[in-house]
Regions:
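Integrase module of LTR retroelements
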Residues: 1-150
Length: 150
């Protein structure tokens, strides 16, 4: 999971085990190639973040990599909070089909990204794109915003 602390935009992929190769691939594909190279990345001290491959990538990209304090989960409080919200959204989608949670990850991320955040005064989508997302229900019901686009 990657979170932009300013906009609260969340990127997440499902994986059975977090390896250094997975982390490096995530940073390149889900962060750098989509939003540009970050100045700094804060991560936990999991083995996926401590591998030589990730260290080399950070050096090549010029990214400062900071690790959170061990045994102090409050350092990653935002990540833990958002991950909990994503898990709640997924659990409402899957009900008893827990083996299929990864199939609902993108829908859960969409729901989170387009939900109003009181602390920000906007949705993460709005802060990233400069406008609110056009929701499928608005198209279905021909909302004023859809009619104005026509």
């Amino acid at each position: 999971m990657g979170i932009d602390y300013m906009t609260r935009w969340t990127e997440e992929v499902s994986t059975s085990k977090i390896t250094a190769k997975d982390v490096a691939k995530f940073i390149l594909n889900n962060m750098c190639c989509r939003f540009g190279t970050p100045i700094e990345i804060i991560s936990d001290r999991g083995p996926g973040f401590k591998g030589d491959l990730v260290k080399e990538l950070m050096i090549k990209l010029g990214v400062k990599h900071r690790h959170s304090t061990p045994y102090y989960p409050q350092c990653n409080g935002l990540v833990e909070k958002v991950n909990g919200k994503i898990c709640k959204i997924i659990s409402k989608h899957i009900r008893n089909k827990t083996q299929q949670w990864d199939k609902h990850l993108n829908a859960a991320l969409w729901a989170y990204r387009t939900s109003f955040r009181t602390s920000l005064g906007f949705t993460p989508f709005h802060l990233l794109h400069g406008q609110e997302a056009l929701l499928p229900i608005e198209v279905e019901l021909s909302s004023l915003r859809v009619l104005l686009r026509s």
